[in-house]
Protein backbone atom coordinates (compact mmCIF):
# COMPACT_ATOMS: atom_id res chain seq x y z
CA UNK A 1 0.00 0.00 0.00
CA UNK A 2 2.93 2.33 0.59
CA UNK A 3 3.67 2.57 -3.15
CA UNK A 4 0.02 3.21 -4.01
CA UNK A 5 -0.34 5.95 -1.39
CA UNK A 6 2.88 7.59 -2.60
CA UNK A 7 1.54 7.45 -6.16
CA UNK A 8 -1.66 9.22 -5.07
CA UNK A 9 0.24 11.83 -3.04
CA UNK A 10 2.62 12.58 -5.90
CA UNK A 11 -0.34 12.89 -8.25
CA UNK A 12 -2.18 15.18 -5.83
CA UNK A 13 -5.33 13.06 -5.59
CA UNK A 14 -5.14 11.77 -2.02
CA UNK A 15 -7.50 13.40 0.47
CA UNK A 16 -7.23 11.20 3.57
CA UNK A 17 -6.45 7.66 4.70
CA UNK A 18 -6.62 5.59 7.88
CA UNK A 19 -3.68 5.41 10.24
CA UNK A 20 -1.57 2.36 9.49
CA UNK A 21 -2.81 1.83 5.93
CA UNK A 22 0.55 2.84 4.49
CA UNK A 23 2.19 0.07 6.53
CA UNK A 24 0.02 -2.74 5.13
CA UNK A 25 2.23 -5.01 3.03
CA UNK A 26 0.07 -8.10 2.49
CA UNK A 27 -2.30 -8.23 -0.52
CA UNK A 28 -5.48 -6.28 0.17
CA UNK A 29 -8.92 -5.98 -1.43
CA UNK A 30 -10.75 -2.67 -1.68
CA UNK A 31 -14.24 -1.58 -2.69
CA UNK A 32 -15.98 1.54 -3.83
CA UNK A 33 -19.75 2.03 -3.88
CA UNK A 34 -22.09 3.42 -6.55
CA UNK A 35 -25.68 4.16 -5.53
CA UNK A 36 -28.26 3.81 -8.37
CA UNK A 37 -29.75 7.30 -8.11
CA UNK A 38 -30.01 7.44 -11.93
CA UNK A 39 -29.93 5.04 -14.87
CA UNK A 40 -26.41 6.11 -15.81
CA UNK A 41 -23.15 6.92 -14.11
CA UNK A 42 -21.96 10.50 -14.54
CA UNK A 43 -18.55 12.09 -15.01
CA UNK A 44 -18.06 12.36 -11.23
CA UNK A 45 -18.26 8.57 -11.03
CA UNK A 46 -15.48 8.33 -13.60
CA UNK A 47 -13.02 9.34 -10.86
CA UNK A 48 -14.05 6.25 -8.88
CA UNK A 49 -13.79 4.01 -11.94
CA UNK A 50 -10.30 5.34 -12.68
CA UNK A 51 -9.46 4.85 -9.00
CA UNK A 52 -10.46 1.18 -9.09
CA UNK A 53 -8.49 0.61 -12.28
CA UNK A 54 -5.50 2.42 -10.81
CA UNK A 55 -5.61 0.22 -7.69
CA UNK A 56 -5.58 -2.93 -9.81
CA UNK A 57 -2.32 -1.79 -11.42
CA UNK A 58 -0.77 -1.73 -7.94
CA UNK A 59 -1.83 -5.27 -7.08
CA UNK A 60 -4.87 -4.26 -5.03
CA UNK A 61 -8.00 -6.33 -5.76
CA UNK A 62 -10.81 -3.88 -6.66
CA UNK A 63 -14.50 -4.56 -6.04
CA UNK A 64 -17.40 -2.35 -7.17
CA UNK A 65 -20.57 -2.23 -5.08
CA UNK A 66 -23.93 -1.29 -6.58
CA UNK A 67 -26.07 0.02 -3.72
CA UNK A 68 -29.60 -1.08 -4.55
CA UNK A 69 -30.47 -1.12 -0.83
CA UNK A 70 -28.76 2.14 0.09
CA UNK A 71 -30.18 3.69 -3.08
CA UNK A 72 -33.65 3.15 -1.62
CA UNK A 73 -32.70 5.46 1.28
CA UNK A 74 -30.43 8.15 -0.17
CA UNK A 75 -27.05 9.35 1.03
CA UNK A 76 -27.22 12.82 2.66
CA UNK A 77 -23.47 13.41 2.10
CA UNK A 78 -22.86 16.58 0.14
CA UNK A 79 -26.59 17.33 -0.09
CA UNK A 80 -28.21 20.43 1.41
CA UNK A 81 -31.76 19.11 0.97
CA UNK A 82 -33.52 15.77 1.29
CA UNK A 83 -33.26 13.46 -1.70
CA UNK A 84 -36.47 12.41 -3.44
CA UNK A 85 -37.03 8.74 -2.69
CA UNK A 86 -37.05 6.47 -5.72
CA UNK A 87 -39.58 3.69 -6.27
CA UNK A 88 -38.24 0.13 -5.94
CA UNK A 89 -38.77 -0.64 -9.64
CA UNK A 90 -36.81 2.48 -10.60
CA UNK A 91 -33.96 1.52 -8.27
CA UNK A 92 -33.92 -1.99 -9.76
CA UNK A 93 -33.80 -0.57 -13.29
CA UNK A 94 -31.03 1.88 -12.39
CA UNK A 95 -29.06 -0.86 -10.63
CA UNK A 96 -29.17 -3.06 -13.72
CA UNK A 97 -27.96 -0.19 -15.89
CA UNK A 98 -25.14 0.70 -13.48
CA UNK A 99 -24.02 -2.92 -13.25
CA UNK A 100 -23.84 -3.11 -17.05
CA UNK A 101 -21.91 0.15 -17.18
CA UNK A 102 -19.43 -0.96 -14.51
CA UNK A 103 -18.94 -4.31 -16.22
CA UNK A 104 -18.12 -2.46 -19.43
CA UNK A 105 -15.58 -0.13 -17.85
CA UNK A 106 -14.19 -2.60 -15.30
CA UNK A 107 -13.88 -5.94 -17.11
CA UNK A 108 -12.91 -8.74 -14.76
CA UNK A 109 -13.70 -6.71 -11.63
CA UNK A 110 -16.14 -8.30 -9.17
CA UNK A 111 -19.41 -6.38 -8.87
CA UNK A 112 -21.62 -6.95 -5.83
CA UNK A 113 -25.04 -5.61 -4.90
CA UNK A 114 -25.92 -4.83 -1.29
CA UNK A 115 -29.54 -5.86 -1.81
CA UNK A 116 -28.19 -9.42 -1.60
CA UNK A 117 -27.55 -9.10 2.15
CA UNK A 118 -30.16 -6.50 3.07
CA UNK A 119 -33.08 -8.32 1.46
CA UNK A 120 -34.93 -10.25 4.13
CA UNK A 121 -33.35 -8.35 7.05
CA UNK A 122 -36.00 -7.19 9.51
CA UNK A 123 -36.01 -3.80 11.24
CA UNK A 124 -35.84 -5.52 14.65
CA UNK A 125 -32.82 -7.59 13.66
CA UNK A 126 -31.06 -4.59 12.14
CA UNK A 127 -31.57 -2.38 15.18
CA UNK A 128 -30.43 -5.15 17.55
CA UNK A 129 -27.44 -6.33 15.53
CA UNK A 130 -26.27 -3.07 13.96
CA UNK A 131 -27.87 -0.08 15.66
CA UNK A 132 -26.66 -1.22 19.08
CA UNK A 133 -23.04 -0.53 18.06
CA UNK A 134 -23.60 3.12 17.11
CA UNK A 135 -23.57 6.04 19.55
CA UNK A 136 -25.84 8.98 18.83
CA UNK A 137 -23.26 11.53 19.99
CA UNK A 138 -20.71 10.23 17.51
CA UNK A 139 -23.21 10.23 14.65
CA UNK A 140 -24.32 13.79 15.44
CA UNK A 141 -20.67 14.84 15.32
CA UNK A 142 -20.25 13.83 11.68
CA UNK A 143 -19.90 16.89 9.44
CA UNK A 144 -22.65 15.85 7.03
CA UNK A 145 -25.14 15.27 9.85
CA UNK A 146 -24.19 18.49 11.67
CA UNK A 147 -24.58 20.60 8.55
CA UNK A 148 -27.98 19.16 7.74
CA UNK A 149 -29.29 19.45 11.31
CA UNK A 150 -28.24 23.10 11.43
CA UNK A 151 -29.85 23.84 8.06
CA UNK A 152 -33.42 25.01 7.58
CA UNK A 153 -34.20 21.76 5.73
CA UNK A 154 -32.98 19.53 8.57
CA UNK A 155 -32.57 15.79 8.10
CA UNK A 156 -35.05 12.93 8.25
CA UNK A 157 -34.50 9.78 10.28
CA UNK A 158 -34.36 7.94 6.94
CA UNK A 159 -31.27 9.78 5.71
CA UNK A 160 -29.85 9.96 9.23
CA UNK A 161 -29.82 6.14 9.21
CA UNK A 162 -27.90 5.90 5.93
CA UNK A 163 -24.59 5.81 7.75
CA UNK A 164 -25.63 2.55 9.47
CA UNK A 165 -26.42 0.91 6.15
CA UNK A 166 -23.09 1.84 4.59
CA UNK A 167 -21.27 0.68 7.72
CA UNK A 168 -23.06 -2.65 7.54
CA UNK A 169 -22.00 -2.96 3.89
CA UNK A 170 -18.38 -2.56 4.92
CA UNK A 171 -18.68 -5.07 7.76
CA UNK A 172 -20.38 -7.64 5.52
CA UNK A 173 -17.74 -7.31 2.80
CA UNK A 174 -14.98 -7.43 5.42
CA UNK A 175 -16.35 -10.58 7.07
CA UNK A 176 -17.61 -12.48 4.02
CA UNK A 177 -15.20 -11.34 1.28
CA UNK A 178 -12.10 -10.25 3.19
CA UNK A 179 -12.33 -6.67 1.89
CA UNK A 180 -10.43 -4.50 4.37
CA UNK A 181 -10.37 -1.15 2.54
CA UNK A 182 -13.20 1.16 1.52
CA UNK A 183 -12.52 4.04 -0.86
CA UNK A 184 -14.62 7.01 -1.90
CA UNK A 185 -14.81 10.74 -2.47
CA UNK A 186 -13.85 13.09 0.35
CA UNK A 187 -17.52 13.55 1.30
CA UNK A 188 -17.63 9.85 2.24
CA UNK A 189 -14.99 10.03 4.99
CA UNK A 190 -17.56 10.15 7.80
CA UNK A 191 -19.45 7.13 6.46
CA UNK A 192 -16.22 5.20 5.90
CA UNK A 193 -14.82 5.83 9.39
CA UNK A 194 -18.17 4.81 10.90
CA UNK A 195 -17.84 1.48 9.11
CA UNK A 196 -14.29 1.05 10.41
CA UNK A 197 -15.51 1.73 13.98
CA UNK A 198 -18.40 -0.70 13.56
CA UNK A 199 -16.06 -3.46 12.35
CA UNK A 200 -13.80 -2.81 15.34
CA UNK A 201 -16.72 -2.86 17.81
CA UNK A 202 -17.88 -6.16 16.33
CA UNK A 203 -14.38 -7.55 16.93
CA UNK A 204 -13.97 -8.49 13.27
CA UNK A 205 -10.51 -7.00 12.79
CA UNK A 206 -8.71 -3.95 11.40
CA UNK A 207 -10.31 -2.13 8.47
CA UNK A 208 -9.16 0.95 6.61
CA UNK A 209 -10.46 3.85 4.58
CA UNK A 210 -9.06 6.08 1.84
CA UNK A 211 -10.60 9.08 0.10
CA UNK A 212 -9.82 11.21 -2.94
CA UNK A 213 -10.77 14.86 -3.58
CA UNK A 214 -14.08 15.64 -5.24
CA UNK A 215 -13.95 17.05 -8.76
CA UNK A 216 -14.52 20.77 -8.23
CA UNK A 217 -13.57 23.96 -10.05
CA UNK A 218 -11.70 26.96 -8.64
CA UNK A 219 -14.96 28.21 -7.07
CA UNK A 220 -15.49 24.92 -5.25
CA UNK A 221 -18.43 23.86 -7.44
CA UNK A 222 -18.59 20.31 -8.77
CA UNK A 223 -17.33 19.84 -12.32
CA UNK A 224 -19.70 17.81 -14.46
CA UNK A 225 -22.78 19.99 -14.29
CA UNK A 226 -23.98 22.28 -17.06
CA UNK A 227 -26.93 24.62 -17.45
CA UNK A 228 -28.69 21.84 -19.31
CA UNK A 229 -27.91 19.13 -16.75
CA UNK A 230 -25.45 16.42 -15.80
CA UNK A 231 -22.60 15.09 -17.94
CA UNK A 232 -23.42 11.37 -18.21
CA UNK A 233 -21.26 8.45 -19.29
CA UNK A 234 -24.15 6.94 -21.26
CA UNK A 235 -23.70 8.15 -24.86
CA UNK A 236 -27.46 8.25 -25.40
CA UNK A 237 -27.72 10.85 -22.63
CA UNK A 238 -24.50 12.79 -23.25
CA UNK A 239 -23.08 12.23 -26.72
CA UNK A 240 -19.33 11.89 -27.30
CA UNK A 241 -19.51 15.26 -29.07
CA UNK A 242 -21.13 16.94 -26.08
CA UNK A 243 -18.56 15.37 -23.72
CA UNK A 244 -15.75 16.50 -26.03
CA UNK A 245 -17.05 20.05 -26.18
CA UNK A 246 -17.64 20.18 -22.43
CA UNK A 247 -14.00 19.55 -21.61
CA UNK A 248 -12.68 21.75 -24.42
CA UNK A 249 -14.69 24.64 -22.98
CA UNK A 250 -13.47 24.26 -19.40
CA UNK A 251 -11.19 27.07 -18.19
CA UNK A 252 -7.52 26.31 -18.84
CA UNK A 253 -6.84 26.43 -15.09
CA UNK A 254 -8.92 23.26 -14.57
CA UNK A 255 -6.86 21.13 -16.97
CA UNK A 256 -4.10 19.91 -14.58
CA UNK A 257 -6.72 18.69 -12.08
CA UNK A 258 -8.77 17.01 -14.81
CA UNK A 259 -5.69 15.23 -16.14
CA UNK A 260 -4.88 13.86 -12.69
CA UNK A 261 -8.35 12.66 -11.74
CA UNK A 262 -10.03 11.60 -14.98
CA UNK A 263 -7.20 9.91 -16.87
CA UNK A 264 -5.01 6.87 -16.31
CA UNK A 265 -1.93 8.63 -17.62
CA UNK A 266 1.15 7.77 -15.57
CA UNK A 267 2.52 10.30 -13.09
CA UNK A 268 5.50 10.82 -15.39
CA UNK A 269 3.15 11.67 -18.27
CA UNK A 270 1.21 14.03 -15.99
CA UNK A 271 4.36 15.86 -14.93
CA UNK A 272 5.45 16.19 -18.57
CA UNK A 273 2.05 17.69 -19.38
CA UNK A 274 2.47 20.15 -16.50
CA UNK A 275 5.63 21.48 -18.17
CA UNK A 276 4.01 21.69 -21.59
CA UNK A 277 0.93 23.34 -20.08
CA UNK A 278 3.00 26.40 -19.13
CA UNK A 279 3.79 27.13 -22.78
CA UNK A 280 0.81 25.63 -24.62
CA UNK A 281 -2.28 25.12 -22.40
CA UNK A 282 -4.64 24.77 -25.38
CA UNK A 283 -2.71 21.82 -26.82
CA UNK A 284 -2.61 20.12 -23.41
CA UNK A 285 -6.34 20.67 -22.91
CA UNK A 286 -7.05 19.14 -26.32
CA UNK A 287 -4.85 16.12 -25.55
CA UNK A 288 -6.44 15.57 -22.12
CA UNK A 289 -9.93 15.94 -23.61
CA UNK A 290 -9.16 13.40 -26.31
CA UNK A 291 -7.74 11.02 -23.70
CA UNK A 292 -10.89 11.24 -21.55
CA UNK A 293 -13.32 10.86 -24.46
CA UNK A 294 -11.38 7.87 -25.78
CA UNK A 295 -11.36 6.20 -22.35
CA UNK A 296 -15.12 6.60 -22.00
CA UNK A 297 -16.36 6.16 -25.58
CA UNK A 298 -13.44 4.50 -27.37
CA UNK A 299 -11.62 5.58 -30.51
CA UNK A 300 -14.88 5.55 -32.49
CA UNK A 301 -16.49 7.91 -29.98
CA UNK A 302 -13.59 10.33 -30.23
CA UNK A 303 -13.65 10.20 -34.03
CA UNK A 304 -17.38 10.92 -34.02
CA UNK A 305 -16.92 13.86 -31.65
CA UNK A 306 -14.16 15.27 -33.83
CA UNK A 307 -16.19 14.65 -36.99
CA UNK A 308 -19.19 16.52 -35.59
CA UNK A 309 -16.93 19.34 -34.44
CA UNK A 310 -15.44 19.58 -37.92
CA UNK A 311 -18.84 19.30 -39.58
CA UNK A 312 -19.96 22.34 -37.62
CA UNK A 313 -17.54 24.34 -39.73
CA UNK A 314 -19.07 26.15 -42.69
CA UNK A 315 -19.64 23.87 -45.65
CA UNK A 316 -19.84 20.58 -43.74
CA UNK A 317 -23.26 20.54 -42.05
CA UNK A 318 -24.58 17.73 -44.25
CA UNK A 319 -22.80 15.16 -42.04
CA UNK A 320 -24.53 16.23 -38.81
CA UNK A 321 -26.96 13.67 -37.37
CA UNK A 322 -30.32 14.45 -35.80
CA UNK A 323 -28.86 13.60 -32.36
CA UNK A 324 -26.08 16.13 -32.96
CA UNK A 325 -28.66 18.86 -33.55
CA UNK A 326 -30.39 17.82 -30.33
CA UNK A 327 -27.06 17.94 -28.48
CA UNK A 328 -26.46 21.50 -29.63
CA UNK A 329 -29.92 22.49 -28.41
CA UNK A 330 -29.35 20.77 -25.05
CA UNK A 331 -26.13 22.76 -24.69
CA UNK A 332 -28.10 26.00 -24.91
CA UNK A 333 -27.29 26.65 -28.56
CA UNK A 334 -30.83 26.45 -29.88
CA UNK A 335 -34.04 28.42 -30.16
CA UNK A 336 -37.57 27.23 -31.02
CA UNK A 337 -39.60 29.08 -33.64
CA UNK A 338 -43.03 28.60 -35.16
CA UNK A 339 -42.62 26.89 -38.54
CA UNK A 340 -45.49 28.68 -40.30
CA UNK A 341 -44.46 32.13 -39.12
CA UNK A 342 -40.76 31.56 -39.86
CA UNK A 343 -40.65 29.95 -43.32
CA UNK A 344 -40.52 32.55 -46.09
CA UNK A 345 -38.96 35.29 -43.96
CA UNK A 346 -35.79 37.04 -45.05
CA UNK A 347 -32.69 35.61 -43.42
CA UNK A 348 -31.42 39.07 -42.58
CA UNK A 349 -34.54 39.61 -40.46
CA UNK A 350 -34.27 36.19 -38.81
CA UNK A 351 -30.61 36.62 -37.86
CA UNK A 352 -31.45 39.89 -36.13
CA UNK A 353 -34.71 38.55 -34.67
CA UNK A 354 -33.04 35.64 -32.87
CA UNK A 355 -30.29 37.90 -31.55
CA UNK A 356 -27.59 36.41 -33.73
CA UNK A 357 -26.79 39.85 -35.16
CA UNK A 358 -27.23 43.15 -33.34
CA UNK A 359 -28.65 45.03 -36.31
CA UNK A 360 -29.57 44.70 -39.95
CA UNK A 361 -26.53 46.82 -40.74
CA UNK A 362 -24.26 44.26 -39.06
CA UNK A 363 -26.09 41.41 -40.81
CA UNK A 364 -25.72 43.10 -44.24
CA UNK A 365 -21.99 43.61 -43.67
CA UNK A 366 -21.50 39.95 -42.67
CA UNK A 367 -23.54 38.73 -45.64
CA UNK A 368 -21.39 40.80 -48.00
CA UNK A 369 -18.28 39.25 -46.39
CA UNK A 370 -19.76 35.73 -46.75
CA UNK A 371 -19.68 35.46 -42.97
CA UNK A 372 -23.26 34.31 -42.27
CA UNK A 373 -24.19 30.70 -43.02
CA UNK A 374 -27.39 28.69 -43.18
CA UNK A 375 -26.35 25.07 -42.87
CA UNK A 376 -23.51 24.56 -45.31
CA UNK A 377 -24.12 27.59 -47.48
CA UNK A 378 -23.26 31.28 -47.05
CA UNK A 379 -26.26 33.57 -47.45
CA UNK A 380 -26.21 34.86 -51.01
CA UNK A 381 -27.58 38.36 -50.38
CA UNK A 382 -29.79 40.36 -48.04
CA UNK A 383 -32.91 39.37 -49.98
CA UNK A 384 -32.47 35.61 -49.44
CA UNK A 385 -35.41 33.97 -47.69
CA UNK A 386 -35.87 30.88 -45.52
CA UNK A 387 -36.95 27.98 -47.77
CA UNK A 388 -38.36 24.56 -46.84
CA UNK A 389 -35.45 22.81 -48.57
CA UNK A 390 -33.09 24.26 -45.96
CA UNK A 391 -34.74 22.34 -43.10
CA UNK A 392 -32.81 19.28 -41.86
CA UNK A 393 -34.66 16.27 -40.39
CA UNK A 394 -37.90 18.20 -40.92
CA UNK A 395 -37.20 20.54 -37.97
CA UNK A 396 -33.61 21.85 -37.68
CA UNK A 397 -31.51 24.55 -39.31
CA UNK A 398 -27.98 25.50 -38.27
CA UNK A 399 -27.06 29.18 -38.34
CA UNK A 400 -23.41 30.15 -38.19
CA UNK A 401 -21.38 33.31 -37.98
CA UNK A 402 -17.83 32.35 -38.89
CA UNK A 403 -16.41 29.23 -37.21
CA UNK A 404 -17.36 29.71 -33.56
CA UNK A 405 -20.78 31.32 -33.19
CA UNK A 406 -23.59 28.84 -33.95
CA UNK A 407 -27.29 28.50 -33.25
CA UNK A 408 -29.84 25.80 -34.10
CA UNK A 409 -33.30 26.88 -35.21
CA UNK A 410 -35.83 24.29 -34.02
CA UNK A 411 -39.06 24.56 -35.98
CA UNK A 412 -42.20 23.60 -34.07
Curated annotation (Swiss-Prot):
A motif ('KMSKS' region) lies at residues 222-226. Its main location: cytoplasm. GO terms for biological process: tyrosyl-tRNA aminoacylation. GO terms for cellular component: cytosol. ATP binds at residue 225. Keywords: Aminoacyl-tRNA synthetase, ATP-binding, Cytoplasm, Ligase, Nucleotide-binding, Protein biosynthesis, RNA-binding. Belongs to the class-I aminoacyl-tRNA synthetase family. TyrS type 1 subfamily. Its EC number is 6.1.1.1. It is found in: Cytoplasm. Residues 345-412 form the S4 RNA-binding domain. Homodimer. InterPro entries: aa-tRNA-synth_Ic (IPR002305), Rossmann-like_a/b/a_fold (IPR014729), S4_RNA-bd (IPR002942), S4_RNA-bd_sf (IPR036986), SYY-like_C (IPR054608), Tyr-tRNA-ligase (IPR002307), Tyr-tRNA-ligase_bac-type (IPR024088), Tyr-tRNA-ligase_bac_1 (IPR024107). L-tyrosine binds at residues 31, 162, 166. It catalyses: tRNA(Tyr) + L-tyrosine + ATP = L-tyrosyl-tRNA(Tyr) + AMP + diphosphate + H(+). This is Tyrosine--tRNA ligase. GO terms for molecular function: ATP binding; RNA binding; tyrosine-tRNA ligase activity. Catalyzes the attachment of tyrosine to tRNA(Tyr) in a two-step reaction: tyrosine is first activated by ATP to form Tyr-AMP and then transferred to the acceptor end of tRNA(Tyr). A motif ('HIGH' region) lies at residues 36-45.
Amino acid sequence: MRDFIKHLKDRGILEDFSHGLDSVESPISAYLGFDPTAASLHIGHWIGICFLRRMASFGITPVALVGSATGMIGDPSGKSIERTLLESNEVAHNSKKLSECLSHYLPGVQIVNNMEWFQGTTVIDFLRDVGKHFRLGTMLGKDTIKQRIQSEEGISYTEFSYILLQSYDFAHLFEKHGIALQCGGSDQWGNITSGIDYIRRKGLGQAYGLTYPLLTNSQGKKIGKTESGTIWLDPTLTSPYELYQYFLRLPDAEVPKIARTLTLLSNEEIFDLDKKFLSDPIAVKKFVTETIVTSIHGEDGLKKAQMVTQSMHPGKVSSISEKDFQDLISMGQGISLDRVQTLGKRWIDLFVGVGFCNSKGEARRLIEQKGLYVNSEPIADEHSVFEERQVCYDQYVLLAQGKKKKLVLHLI
